[in-house]
Amino acid sequence: MLERKKPKTAENQKASEENEITQPGGSSAKPALPCLNFEAVLSPAPALIHSTHSLTNSHAHTGSSDCDISCKGMTERIHSINLHNFSNSVLETLNEQRNRGHFCDVTVRIHGSMLRAHRCVLAAGSPFFQDKLLLGYSDIEIPSVVSVQSVQKLIDFMYSGVLRVSQSEALQILTAASILQIKTVIDECTRIVSQNVGDVFPGIQDSGQDTPRGTPESGTSGQSSDTESGYLQSHPQHSVDRIYSALYACSMQNGSGERSFYSGAVVSHHETALGLPRDHHMEDPSWITRIHERSQQMERYLSTTPETTHCRKQPRPVRIQTLVGNIHIKQEMEDDYDYYGQQRVQILERNESEECTEDTDQAEGTESEPKGESFDSGVSSSIGTEPDSVEQQFGAAAPRDGQAEPAQPEQAAEAPAESSAQPNQLEPGASSPERSNESEMDNTVITVSNSSDKGVLQQPSVNTSIGQPLPSTQLYLRQTETLTSNLRMPLTLTSNTQVIGTAGNTYLPALFTTQPAGSGPKPFLFSLPQPLTGQQTQFVTVSQPGLSTFTAQLPAPQPLASSAGHSTASGQGDKKPYECTLCNKTFTAKQNYVKHMFVHTGEKPHQCSICWRSFSLKDYLIKHMVTHTGVRAYQCSICNKRFTQKSSLNVHMRLHRGEKSYECYICKKKFSHKTLLERHVALHSASNGTPPAGTPPGARAGPPGVVACTEGTTYVCSVCPAKFDQIEQFNDHMRMHVSDG
C-alpha cells in the first residue's frame, strides 16, 4: 500500500534551500562539507591560521592562499595565513623579556650566580628542569660540576635555538647538557668532540706530514667548518669511535688483563669505523706508534706483577688533548715498575710514600695539565679527569682483597702536596670536577666511559672501624665555620656539657614524656645527631627546676589568688598536668604541649607555599596566609565589623557583651582582658601603698588614697591625641584600638 507523499511546507522548503550548496557554475549539489583548497591546507608551512571572517578588503600575507566557497546568493572567501617565522618571533620576544627581567618566575643557581628565566621555556627545553618544576620548585640548584658559562649558553640555546661551541669548550657543554638532559645538544657535542679526533686521517692525505693536523702533538685544530665551529645542524650523526674515551675506559680496569689490547684494538677499530682502507706500506703517525709502545710496556709489567695497588706510581692512561704546546706521552722505564713493586710492599712507611710522590712529579712534569683547565680541554673526560687521584682517597680506607691494614694520614696527604709542587697545577676551583665529585659524593666515585655512553658507579667498601674522616677530603670539603653554626638552642637552656653539632643538620629532641608518681626529678637529654666521624652521641643536660607529680592534688581554689599573674576568676580548678620545664608553662592537652615544644627546639615543620616561610605551628601558618589573601573572613554580627583573625573577633565581642572576667584584687576593678588587668596591677605596684604579699584577699590595704592612686594623673593615648583622667576610661579607649587591629 503506497503512502501518499506529503507536500513540502514553506518552512521545510526554506530549510532545504539553506542547506543546498551550489558550485560557482550554478549546478546544484547535495548538502556536504564546505569545499577547501587542499593545496593550501597541505602546504608544508609550519603554521596555518584559518580566518573565517570576510577579508575581501584586506591583503593577505606573502604565501597565503585563497579558497572560495560559493553559496546561494553569496560568496565567502577564506584566507589561509602562513606565518613562517612565528615560532622564532615568539622565542625572540620571550628572550627580550628575560633580558629585561619581565615575567621571570624561575631562578637557576650555580656557583653562587643566579639566572632568571621562564618556567615554560625551561620545562620545554630540558627534562631536568621539567622534573624540578613539576615538583613545585621555583629555585633550582645546578650541580657544581659545570661552569656558569655552560649553563648560560644552554639557556640561551633554549630561547634562540642557536648554540655556538668551540672545540675547546665542546666537552664542557657536553657535560652541562648531560645534566640538563638536552639530547640534541648531547648528540651534537659528542659528534664535535669525536670529529676532533676523526679529522686527523683526512689530514694525512692532504698535508703529507708525519704528524697530522688536529693531533695532540700538532697543537692545532682540524679543518674548519660550520660543523666544527659548533652550529647545530640536523643531519645524520657519523658513527665515529672515540679513541680518548676507549683508552680512558680501559684505564679504569685497575690493572686487569683487559689493558693488554687497549691500544691496537681501539686504533684498528677507529680506522674501520671511519671507512679508511688500511695501507700496510704507509707508516703510522708517531703518536699512534707511541701508543703501541706503551701497550707493550704495560703487557710486560702485567705479566710480571700479580696484582696492583693504588699508588701515584701506577701508569696513567694516555690522554689525547688539543693544547697549545706539544704533549709527550709518558714513557715508563723498567726500574719504575720495580720501584712500584717495592712501594706496594712498604706502603705504610712515610719515607717511601714521599719518595714515590717526588718521582711521580718528576716523571709527569711534561704530561701534567692544570686541574682547573681540565674542563676546557678538547677531548679530556669531564668527570673522571684524574682517576688515580680520585681512587687514592679510597686506597687507604678500603685496601684490596679485604686487607684490614690501617690507613696512614701521611700517605693520603701527599695528593694535596703534589698539586702545590707542580708549577703548572692550579688549585681546584669551584667548577673543578675533583672538588665537585668528592664534596657531593663521599663514598661513590663516578667515572664516565664515553665508548659505551653510560656512567659507571663504583661503590668502595668503606671500613666501618675507621673513626676519622679521610684526610684527603680536607682539600675539597668546605670546613664548617663553627661547630654549632646551625644549632638553635633555647635562651633558657643552660648546661656545662659541651654541645657538639654537625653543620647543616638540625636536631630534634625527643618529646618529653610524663613522669610517674614517686619518681625523682630526672634531667632531660637533648640528643644530638651522631657526627660522621664516629664519635659518641653528645647530650645536653637540662636539670628540672622541680616538676610536681601529676597525681598530686592542686591547692584548693581561692576566691582571689594571692598572685596577680595567676588570679583568674575562671579555670582555677582545672588540672594542667603537662608543664614545660623550660618556661614553666602548663597545658591541659598533650597535643598543645607537643606544639609548644617546637618553640624551644626551633623546629618549623609548617611552610608557606607562596613565600616559603616556615612556622612552628599550623595556626601561625594559617594566620600568615591572610597576609597573602587579605580576606577578612570573621565578621561581627552586631556591628558588621570584619577581622582577619578569629581571636580578634572574640576580643571585639567582649565589648558588646560587656564581659569583664578579670578583676583587680586591690581595687575590685574588672577588666575584659588579662593584659589590661596586668597593666592595671602594674600601676598599683608602682605606688607606695602596695599591700604586702601576705595580705588576705578582699582586705583594704593602706589608706583610702591607695584606691584612688591614679587621681590627678592624665592618661594620653599613644595612637590618637585623646586624654583621660580615669584609668578605666583610658583602658576602654585602648581596647578600641586593639579591636581595630
From Swiss-Prot:
Sumoylated with SUMO1. Keywords: DNA-binding, Isopeptide bond, Metal-binding, Nucleus, Phosphoprotein, Repeat, Transcription, Transcription regulation, Ubl conjugation, Zinc, Zinc-finger. Residues 354-367 have a biased composition (Acidic residues). The keyword Cell division does not apply. Its main location: nucleus. The keyword Signal does not apply. Specifically expressed in early hippocampal neurons, cerebellar granule cells and gliogenic progenitors as well as in differentiated glia. Expressed in adult and aged myogenic satellite cells. It is found in: Nucleus. Residues 206-235 have a biased composition (Polar residues). There is a cross-link at K330 (Glycyl lysine isopeptide (Lys-Gly) (interchain with G-Cter in SUMO1)). Residues 104-167 form the BTB domain. The modification Phosphoserine is found at S353. A zinc finger (C2H2-type) spans 578-600, 606-628, 634-656, 662-684, 715-737. This is Zinc finger and BTB domain-containing protein 20. It comes from Mus musculus. The gene is Zbtb20.
